[in-house]
Amino acid sequence: MQESSISEKIKELRTDLKMNQKNFSAAIGIRQSTLSSYENGVVTPSNDVLLTIAQKFHVSLDWLFGLSENKVQISNL
């Protein structure tokens, strides 16, 4: 199985949510051009941005980093 990059995971998440770049970037507090740079692999998102994505859209950081196939964030009960 091919490992996906963070840029591919961000784009996959956005398209799964049926969001355009404008709405997704606004939801996480970044510019659309910055999101485009992330998705195209030009710039690597900071840890703060990745944490915001994980929290806002309830996905695991392990999934974003390609360390797990489990997309859903498991909360501590």
Regions found by a protein language model. Name each.
Residues K18-S37, T52:
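Short alpha-helical DNA-recognition segment
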Residues M1, Q55, F65-L77:
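Short, charged recognition helix plus adjacent turn
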Residues T34, G41-T44:
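A secondary-structure capping/hinge motif
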Residues K11, T15, G29, N40-V42, ...:
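Residue-level detection of the helix-turn-helix DNA-binding "recognition helix"
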Residues E8, K18-M19, P45-D48:
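Residue-level signal for the short linker/turn that defines the boundary of a DNA-recognition helix
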Residues D48-W63:
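DNA major-groove recognition helix of helix-turn-helix/homeodomain DNA-binding modules
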